[in-house]
Amino acid sequence: NLLANHDSRNARIDHPGIYGSYLSTHRGNVDYRNNVIYNWGSNTTYGGEDGSFNIVNNYYKPGPASKEKKYFVDAYWYNSSSNVGSAYPRLYMSGNYHAGSYASSINGDQWSGVYYHPQGNDPSTTDGRLSAPLSIKAGDATVCHTTTHTAAGAFDAVLSYAGASLCRDAVD
């Protein structure tokens, strides 16, 4: 996937409020993998309140409108009064790459690429750091499998194959 030229929501990961009374039955683990995020404006990937996410091998390439953010994820937290959770997201971080020279330090330390958005009386930021990827299951509870590229491989694949039509044209 190519997420390009947005001011924000690159992606806005899984806000628990969208589930209403179905939160316990419809919310599951989310796998955000092999995306190219370009020219993000004011924010890159953010949100995730009290959810569970694999953030793997995504390529963050700043463009002319990109703010100099030194992170992959801006993690949000909800308090218990919101009735939708009371924690930052649980994250498995691996292989993400930030092409901005101002942010090269986060490529070697994925956790330094997570910004825990300050929202008052926050819980510990280390509780949600997962050391192994989350299992992703289909509706029938079978485990899903996917091809995983390196972040650089994903960047090359997206530039080579993503576009508006099957046949490459001037727009692609």
Language-model features: locations:
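Extracellular low-complexity, Gly/Ser/Thr-rich intrinsically disordered linkers
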Residues: 125-172
